[in-house]
Amino acid sequence: MGNLRSSFVFFLLALVTYTYAATIEVRNNCPYTVWAASTPIGGGRRLDRGQTWVINAPRGTKMARVWGRTNCNFNAAGRGTCQTGDCGGVLQCTGWGKPPNTLAEYALDQFSGLDFWDISLVDGFNIPMTFAPTNPSGGKCHAIHCTANINGECPRELRVPGGCNNPCTTFGGQQYCCTQGPCGPTFFSKFFKQRCPDAYSYPQDDPTSTFTCPGGSTNYRVIFCPNGQAHPNFPLEMPGSDEVAK
């Protein structure tokens, strides 16, 4: 009976190990509330300053992203709106957020057993961010950052309340590498790249912006406002936002 019980416990541990490839820890260090969002797993969570949310990501997860929503106001049923990053007016996101929003993107246990991950500004910028493996292993498996004052320095053409749009959102078209086909960096993509060299600045910015870690043995951490404070141009709380659903 004892051996049977031990075997069952071992089976459960093995099943958990097999099912989850990584944990994604999301932490808010901003001096304001951030409503974190995660798809296709996780949904959403209110994070006051200093709070953390841990997401268990299954093996093979791909096209996944984590972002922060700002100046949100949700009712007790989890319905409402956000100034940036809104995902259809719900707390629990099932689709992508409305730009602008700084993105942490990842795909787990893919080609050659590697995790692929990045910070993307292809949907613009709203919150400074660090994305890092908790157990870096060298090479391209190390912390990456986008912490510049992009909102404060945003070109006039891309400015919106609470953030800075990518030109693909504002203008679209091949001129800004928003469609398939050869293209190079533009004035606007250079603006983002110079301030956040680790991050994707336009859709075809792969060579300097994709990072890899060993799949199945690496966990990750996303930190909003990693320096613990926001620039003056970053969003403040909306009136009544302390009455949102938690």
Curated annotation (Swiss-Prot):
PROSITE patterns: THAUMATIN_1, THAUMATIN_2. Highly expressed in roots and flower buds. GO terms for cellular component: vacuole. Residues 1-21 form the signal peptide. The keyword Signal applies. It is found in: Vacuole. Keywords: Disulfide bond, Pathogenesis-related protein, Plant defense, Signal, Stress response, Vacuole. Disulfide bonds join C30-C225, C72-C82, C87-C93, C141-C213, C146-C196, C154-C164, C168-C177, C178-C183. PANTHER family: OS03G0233200 PROTEIN. This is Osmotin. It comes from Nicotiana tabacum (Common tobacco). The gene is AP24.
